[in-house]
């Protein structure tokens, strides 16, 4: 969802760095970029191990989500990525089944879907936060394919992150790597197709 449907990454980054400040964590830009595509819990678990923290990952998660909630509700610049809404409508109109498979929490997913009125276009939503393994584990995409009712060879994944692309590749599902102006230091080498504009994958194409 983040980086493909909405550009909430700047909001998440603000929330994470506020959380880092709360707990006095010195997180480099390169370390932060390596988190892209992972669930909040997985990231916080990694932070606890790296910095040898005596607190639980859930304490970090709660701090980050508190900051994100405030930023989400007050940042007027938050909007959908150019062309994303048109692509969703195009696929829906042509009877393609859409399943959202995101590392974001279901709370965040529902907030985004409510804000942009997206529920009617999707047959299901999956949060990686509710699964045993986070991306780059393929579990989330295998579950999405199963929910769609189609063989995975007839499905596609649209991803903007290294971890998501690895997960799709490991699942054996055709992966479209979306390389946008907001994509930083992500590896698209395992993507089956790399695009920079959603017009490149509209239904007629």
Predicted regions and their residues:
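Active-site neighborhood of HAD-like aspartate-dependent phosphohydrolases
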Residues: 1-33
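Conserved SAM-binding loop
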Residues: 5, 80, 98-101, 133, ...
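Short beta->alpha linker loops
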Residues: 11, 35-39, 79-83, 104, ...
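A metal-dependent, Asp-based hydrolase signature
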Residues: 37-71, 90
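Short, acidic loop-to-helix structural element flanking the phosphoryl-transfer center
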Residues: 70-100, 106, 110
């Amino acid at each position: 969802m983040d980086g493909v449907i909405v550009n909430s990454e700047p909001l998440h980054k603000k929330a994470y760095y506020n959380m880092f400040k709360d707990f006095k964590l010195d997180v480099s830009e390169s370390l932060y970029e390596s988190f892209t595509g992972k669930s909040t819990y997985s990231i916080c678990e990694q932070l606890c191990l790296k910095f040898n923290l005596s607190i639980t990952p859930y304490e970090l998660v709660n701090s980050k989500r508190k900051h994100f909630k405030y930023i989400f509700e007050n940042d007027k610049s938050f909007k959908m990525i150019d062309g994303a809404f048109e692509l969703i409508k195009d696929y829906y109109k042509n009877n393609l089944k859409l399943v959202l498979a995101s590392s974001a929490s279901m709370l965040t997913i529902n907030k985004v879907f409510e804000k942009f009125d997206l529920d009617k276009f999707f047959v299901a939503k999956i949060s990686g936060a509710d699964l045993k393994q986070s991306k780059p584990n393929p579990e989330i995409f295998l579950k999405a394919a199963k929910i769609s009712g189609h063989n995975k060879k007839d499905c596609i994944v649209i991803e903007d992150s290294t971890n998501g692309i690895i997960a799709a590749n490991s699942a054996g599902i055709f992966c479209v790597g979306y390389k946008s102006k907001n994509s930083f230091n992500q590896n698209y080498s395992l993507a089956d197709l790399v695009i920079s504009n959603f017009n490149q994958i509209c239904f007629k194409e």
